[in-house]
């Protein structure tokens, strides 16, 4: 079932906004705002990296 045009355009607009805001944000805020498929590997990599820094 397809979403109405208005719903689809809002979704696209919201995604565009998150990409525009990305450079100003930092860390987890950016990871949460960007589309999941783009950040899953990035987030996992960051978590592993932080774990190595924090753990003795």
From Swiss-Prot:
Domain of life: Eukaryota
Protein name in UniProt: Putative uncharacterized protein ARHGAP5-AS1
Lineage per the UniProt record: Eukaryota, Metazoa, Chordata, Craniata, Vertebrata
